[in-house]
Amino acid sequence: MNRFFLSLFLGGALLCAAAGQASASFRVHLQDGSSHVIAPAKVEQSPAQAVVQRALSTLGTPYRWGGSSRERGFDCSGLVNYAFKKVDDLDLPRTSRALSRVDGPKVAKGQLEPGDLLFFRIRGRSVDHVAIYLGNGRFIHAPSRGNTVRIDKLSNSYWSKRFQLARRVMPEGTQLAANG
C-alpha cells in the first residue's frame, strides 16, 4: 500500500516538475515512518528545440537590415545567428549566402526537421534569404523592411517558387552550450 502511494506521489511530483510547477526538492513521509526526498525531474531540451524556442521568442520583432537583437530588430541571418547562439560548437557566418555554404548535409523538403535552415532566392541569381524550419511545413524568418519576424508556410506559392535548398547545420550529438 505504501509503495502504491509513493508511486502515485512520485508520478504526480514528476508531472508537476515537468510542467514547471515544482522547483525545489521535498520530503515525503510514509505511514511506516520512512521518508524519501523527491527532487523535481529536469526535462532536457534538444538543441533543435532550443533553437526553435529561441526563434519563436522573437515573433513580432521588427525587421532591421543588419539587425541581430530583439531590442534593435533582425534581418534574416541575424535572426538565425540569434536563434543558434546557445548551440555549442557552431560558429555560423552572418550572411544568408555564407550560411547556405556551411558544413552540414543538404536536406530534401520531405526530410526537413525543426532547426533546419531553409534558403531562398528572392532577387538575383543566388541565395539571399534564410529561415528556420519549425515543423509541419512552417518556418520562421525576418522577411523584409516594413515587416516583423513571422511564421510562413513553405507550401505558400511565393515561398515554394523561391526555395533553393535546406541544410542541417546541427549534426547528431550537437549539445547546448554550458551557459545555455
PLM ranges: what are they?
Residues 2-5, 23-43, 47, 106, ...:
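Aromatic- and glycine-rich peptidoglycan recognition patches
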Residues 7-17:
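Bacterial N-terminal signal peptides
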Residues 39-42, 61-114:
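Catalytic cysteine-centered active-site loop
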Residues 47-51, 55, 76, 80, ...:
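Stable alpha-helical elements in mature extracytoplasmic
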Residues 49-50, 55-67:
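Short, contiguous, helix-prone interaction/anchoring segments in small proteins
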Residues 115-117, 137:
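Structural motif
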